[in-house]
A protein has these predicted regions:
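Cysteine-centric segments in proteins
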Residues: 1-77
Length: 77
């Protein structure tokens, strides 16, 4: 699903780091090696139909590579 993050991501928590990540081999092959972390947080997003919703997001991040594979996991509001 396409969406646009329109606010700062808040309440960021680390879910897992390094070899604890199931998709680590994919991340390193697609984006390069690094200290990969899986994180979650909440933010306002604009959905394709124009609605703005408060959602929980999950994504992967590595220093020097940035945020990758941002996904909506659930609607908070």
């Amino acid at each position: 699903m396409k969406f646009e993050v329109i606010s700062q991501i808040e309440n960021i928590e680390v879910i897992s780091v390094g070899t604890d990540i199931r998709n680590l081999a994919y991340l390193e092959k697609a984006y390069g090696s690094g200290r990969w972390r899986k994180l979650k947080g909440v933010a306002h997003v604009r959905l394709p139909n124009g609605n703005i919703r408060w959602v929980e997001l999950h994504w992967y991040e590595a220093h020097g590579i940035g945020r990758k594979n941002i996904k909506i996991k659930r609607y908070v509001e």
